[in-house]
């Protein structure tokens, strides 16, 4: 006879305001939706949605990732989002638009791309 497996009920909490962190690199786009304290509620990546290789870095892949993360965070009762965009990737604007299309009211969009004050030496230029 099989043992009864006890599954713990997932504790759902309601959060009215959150922060969407969009990390858009040249190779991938990562969308993380957190509460105000920074605790992750939902996340998605372009690569995790089935896009591989150079298709990961397209605006459409970033849009799909933002939609998936946005719909997953709707379970927490989120209504308003502040958007923090980091990185120079091609999926920056399309991810923000996708979050608005899911149904969130976007309060602010902030660019938090780290800019060095002459820090590390950048990689050498490509010769194709």
Curated annotation (Swiss-Prot):
Q: Where are the transmembrane segments?
A: none
Concerning Gene3D superfamilies, the annotation shows: Ribosomal protein S11
Q: Which UniProt keywords apply?
A: Ribonucleoprotein, Ribosomal protein, RNA-binding, rRNA-binding
InterPro entries attached here? Ribosomal_uS11, Ribosomal_uS11_bac-type, Ribosomal_uS11_CS, Ribosomal_uS11_sf
The question of whether Iron is a record keyword is answered with: no
Q: Which Pfam families match?
A: Ribosomal_S11 (PF00411)
- Which is an annotated GO molecular function term of this record? rRNA binding
State if 4Fe-4S is listed as a keyword.
Answer: no
Q: What are the GO BP annotations of this UniProt entry?
A: translation
- A single GO CC term, please? ribonucleoprotein complex
Return the similarity comment: Belongs to the universal ribosomal protein uS11 family.
- Job of this protein: Located on the platform of the 30S subunit, it bridges several disparate RNA helices of the 16S rRNA. Forms part of the Shine-Dalgarno cleft in the 70S ribosome.
**Subunit organization:** Part of the 30S ribosomal subunit. Interacts with proteins S7 and S18. Binds to IF-3.
Write the protein's name. Small ribosomal subunit protein uS11
């Amino acid at each position: 006879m099989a043992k009864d497996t006890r599954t713990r009920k997932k504790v759902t909490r309601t959060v009215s305001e959150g922060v969407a962190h969009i990390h858009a690199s040249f190779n991938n786009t990562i969308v993380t939706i957190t509460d105000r304290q920074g605790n992750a509620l939902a996340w998605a990546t372009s690569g995790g949605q089935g896009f591989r290789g150079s298709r990961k870095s397209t605006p459409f892949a970033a849009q799909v990732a933002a939609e998936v993360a946005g719909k997953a965070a709707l379970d927490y009762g989120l209504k308003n989002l502040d958007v923090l965009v980091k990185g120079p990737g091609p999926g920056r604007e399309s991810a923000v638009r996708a979050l608005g299309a899911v149904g969130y009211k976007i309060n602010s969009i902030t660019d938090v791309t780290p800019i060095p004050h002459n820090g590390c030496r950048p990689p050498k230029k490509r010769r194709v």
